[in-house]
Amino acid sequence: MTHKKQFDSPPRRVALFVTCMVDMIYPEVGMATVELLERQGVEVVFPAEQTCCGQPAFNAGFWDEARPLARRFVDIFEPLVRQKQVDAVVAPSGSCTTMTSHFYQLLLDDEPGYRERAAFLGAATFELTEFLVDVLGVTEVGARFDGRLSYHACCHLLRELGIDRQPRALLDAVEGVELVEMTGAEECCGFGGLFAIKNSGISTAMGQRKAQNIAKSDADAVALCDVSCMTHINGLLSREGQRCRAVHIAQVLTNQVDVAARPASAVSEPEVKGAPRRWQDDKVKG
């Protein structure tokens, strides 16, 4: 377990590790993350040369292929922290934060130089809600959500990082929200990266159970901290014909989710500012 860096004063400059899916598919989540941090007086820098952290290859057992990506990540972010150009690295993903802060030391165990650098960097790498609550001491961020909101605890976030109290505290402080606890909130949604491809039948069954539990909660939206789980859950909710949608917690905390934008009878999901066009396209095709 990585021991997290302690700060004598609140960090005021961080590097954003944006992650592949946020960068390529959900840039609005990355922008919401930046907005959220800047509202707290934190300057955000974005190392443009960053790439995949290597997690897909690592999880598939291709460690030799994952190591160059791990070294590159360390080479990009570690000097920024070491030279005090930034105070910390923040990512809007429990899954990728787990990879870079926990598994890099295992992956680079036979490379003493990189192993030490990875441990140093891992201590300064934080998942978004962890950084807001545990480091900045913030729970109230000026968010409002006029509707019923549930929460899905993503696996890496909960089981590897031990983060659960932090996102719940942030959501609890949202003005106007009615928080509803779904059955099995801590149960896996069935995505699991390559698991969803290699074991699609099991993955779908797990996702359907999650979608059914969400429907029973009668929530307008489900907040979570990983866009990979968000993608999987939304696919199953759409297939099940549910109007509820999963949204990243950064979108909730920056007021980008509006369930009251139009009457429920007129929409198949809550409106998300900057949402992918396919949500609207699916509605037209239907």
Name each model feature, range by range.
Residues 1-286:
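Iron-sulfur cluster-binding electron-transfer modules in prokaryotic oxidoreductases
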